[in-house]
């Protein structure tokens, strides 16, 4: 197999073979779209039990004209990188097989996001391969770049957790928050979060026009947020009438005085040089604060804030496309870092305006 760890100019010229396991869903389709336009990746296999034998373009319209076809996931060819876009529980059961055929595994499910078996017992239904948990690296280069470089197992973050963590991280990194402060997180997310299979609550007649609390407490992404920021949060999630997007409004109550200058210093210090984070903090015009519509189809995250001195509160906003920055785009970005490729390769699209409901 090709060595996927070269750096510099050679890395930008090399071809990296890749398979996508579970490529028939929405996230799998986004991943295939990105890899098909990537200057380095060569897709050799796309699997789906339910769609085996069908052309990829018949399921994912952006890939019409591609000669790729879905295959059964049982007999896989050796590749440099294996992307797993499967439901929770699949990757942990097949992780040994994945590493038999690939040097690097990028898992987009929840199977390796948490650090300990005890966390999976608490938040999920246990874990079949706990020995891999300490080997996995969380797929957010903005705050985990050093550890992702050369990583063999990459764990994609949850979309709601990604939006929340990117919004709050600078406050901890720059000492505005130290842990223990009250943080209330309110996330609104589009219907694509439920996947292509959906369900009764995701059907158009039931979903259209809603602002529906579906996880007032106990959302599993809360575990990721608390793990990464090392603090507790009060987290609530709403299903809303859009297809793409996750918007997090974070109400933060710091223990000491904070100025707008402090906030700008923190956020610029963390994100000024990041290619996929842009600030939207007040100003003028229609798009004054982060919103999913402005980043639909991109790997961008928008972050902004307002200070509420009378209530001793900071309101932090963050917005992403849940299928891109919250999943497929994040996975490709992390893979670029792990393999020493150009970070922005395959992810340069900056969005459209105007657009309809994302």
Show where each model-derived region lies.
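C-terminal active-site/capping subdomain that shapes the small-molecule cofactor and substrate pocket
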Residues: 251-358
């Amino acid at each position: 197999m090709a060595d996927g760890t070269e750096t510099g100019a050679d890395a930008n010229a090399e071809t990296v073979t890749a398979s996508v396991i579970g490529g028939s869903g929405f996230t799998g389709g986004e991943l295939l779209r990105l890899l098909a336009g990537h200057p380095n990746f060569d897709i050799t296999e796309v699997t789906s039990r339910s769609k085996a034998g069908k052309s990829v373009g018949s399921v994912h319209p952006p890939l019409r004209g591609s000669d790729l076809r879905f295959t059964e996931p049982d007999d896989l060819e050796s590749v440099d990188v294996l992307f797993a876009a499967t439901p929770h529980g699949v990757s942990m059961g097949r992780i040994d097989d994945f590493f038999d055929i690939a040097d690097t595994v990028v898992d987009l499910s929840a199977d390796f996001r948490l650090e300990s078996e005890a966390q999976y017992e608490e938040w999920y239904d246990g874990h079949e391969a706990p020995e891999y948990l300490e080997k996995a690296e969380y797929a957010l280069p903005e705050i985990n770049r050093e550890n992702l470089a050369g990583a063999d197992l990459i764990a994609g973050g949850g979309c709601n957790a990604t939006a929340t963590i990117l919004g709050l991280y600078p406050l901890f990194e720059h000492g505005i928050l130290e842990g223990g402060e009250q943080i209330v997180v309110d996330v609104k997310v589009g219907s694509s979060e439920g996947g292509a299979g959906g369900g009764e609550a995701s059907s158009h007649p039931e979903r259209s026009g809603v602002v529906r609390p579906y996880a007032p407490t106990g959302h599993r992404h809360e575990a990721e947020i608390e793990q990464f920021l090392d603090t507790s949060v009060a987290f609530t999630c709403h299903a809303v009438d859009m297809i793409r997007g996750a918007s997090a409004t974070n109400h933060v109550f710091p223990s000491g005085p904070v100025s707008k200058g402090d906030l700008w210093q923190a956020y610029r210090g963390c994100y000024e040089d990041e290619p996929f984070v842009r600030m939207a903090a007040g100003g003028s015009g229609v798009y004054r604060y982060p919103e999913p519509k402005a980043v639909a189809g991109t790997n961008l995250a928008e972050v902004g804030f307002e200070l509420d001195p009378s209530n001793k509160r900071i309101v932090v906003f963050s917005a992403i496309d849940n299928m891109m920055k919250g999943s497929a785009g994040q996975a490709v970005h992390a893979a670029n870092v792990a393999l020493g490729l150009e970070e922005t390769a395959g992810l340069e699209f900056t969005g459209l305006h105007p657009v309809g409901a994302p």
